[in-house]
Curated annotation (Swiss-Prot):
Residues 270-279 have a biased composition (Basic residues). GO terms for cellular component: endoplasmic reticulum; endoplasmic reticulum membrane; extracellular region; plasma membrane; protein storage vacuole; protein storage vacuole membrane. The chain crosses the membrane at residues 280-300. This is Protein SRC2 homolog.
């Protein structure tokens, strides 16, 4: 397959549509062959350019010479407004057949051309200026080529690439074999003795009957033996704590605890009488409160009586019964 390199310089644009409501718009251009995303290249963003961006951005593409001469390749220029907050918005587009450019090729000379910019509705608004130059033909894949071409840019046809796929429910094969079945650690299974080919474990302590778990059943602790290091219980004096029963039953030797707020029952002796200082304190407080209330009432009553007396004395003065 014979290919050519295509050198482009996106120079500038003029009289474009202004899609920015406030301030000047920022514009950039995207170049591709037939709009294929795999061939897209982008210019820098010209800040605050308004309707007259200037880029002077260089880029290189590779085209299939036979497809270009058969007019199957189109060079597409998309002018876009850069808007980080509201989202980028298309301003215009230019489509140029590669064959048209190839027919204007004159050796190593770079040619500058200007094309009309089309709005999304098809109307012309503004112009785009760029320069181009084609390289010499070379065979794709040959070491004598000027550079390694971009396969996706050589033709508008989709070049199928081998894709590794796996059926649903199966992942990619692993480079390591699956681990053997059985315990994941290097220890033998619990309860197995390699030497005697039997069951092994911790020796059961004296006084504990054999059980399914590693702990003796409740209430099976010996009263006189115990663990090493602890002396046996004394026979005289106060009795020690009785052995605990199963979980959920009251402890032996002690009465069950009553609800919260009630006095607890004593195990020995007569029940203690509640102290009287609480009632005495309550009675004293009640008496003080009543006394204070009575005293306040008396004071108020006396004040009212004094005011009434002063009013009566004023009336007597009006009678004029005395002369001075």
């Amino acid at each position: 397959m014979e290919c050519r390199s295509l050198d482009l310089t996106i120079i500038s644009a003029e009289d474009l549509k202004d899609v920015q409501l406030i301030g000047k718009q920022d514009l950039y251009a995207v170049v591709s062959i037939n709009g294929d995303a795999r061939t897209k290249q982008k210019t820098k963003v010209d800040k605050d350019c308004g309707t007259k961006p200037k880029w002077k951005h260089q880029m290189k593409l590779t085209v299939d010479d036979a497809a270009a001469r058969d007019n199957r390749l189109t060079l597409v220029f998309e002018i876009v407004a850069d808007r980080p907050i509201a989202g980028d918005k298309p301003v215009g587009e230019v489509s140029v057949p590669v064959k048209e450019l190839l027919d204007q090729n004159k050796g190593d000379e770079e040619k500058t051309v200007t094309y009309a910019v089309r709005l999304p509705n098809g109307k012309a608004k503004g112009s785009l200026k760029f320069s181009f130059k084609f390289g010499e033909k070379y065979t794709y894949g040959s070491s004598s080529g000027p550079h390694a071409p971009v396969p996706s840019a050589m033709d508008h046809k989709t070049m199928d690439q081998p894709v590794t796929a796996y059926p649903p429910g199966h992942g990619a094969p692993s480079a390591y074999p699956a681990p053997p079945a059985g315990p994941s650690s290097g220890y033998p299974p619990q309860g197995h003795d390699d030497k005697h080919d039997g069951v092994y474990g911790y020796p059961q302590q004296a006084g504990y009957p054999a059980g399914t778990g590693g702990y003796p059943p409740p209430g099976a602790y010996p009263q006189q033996g115990g663990y090493p290091g602890y002396p046996p219980q004394q026979q005289g004096g106060y009795p020690g704590y009785p052995p605990q029963g199963p979980y959920g039953y009251p402890q032996q030797g002690y009465p069950p605890q009553g609800p919260y707020g009630y006095p607890q029952q004593q195990a020995h002796g007569k029940p203690q009488k509640p102290k009287k200082h609480g009632k005495a304190g309550a009675g004293m407080g009640l008496g003080l409160g009543l006394g204070a209330g009575l005293l306040g009432g008396l004071l108020v009553g006396e004040a009212v009586s004094d005011i009434a007396d002063m009013g009566d004395m004023g009336d007597m003065g009006d009678m004029g019964g005395f002369d001075f």
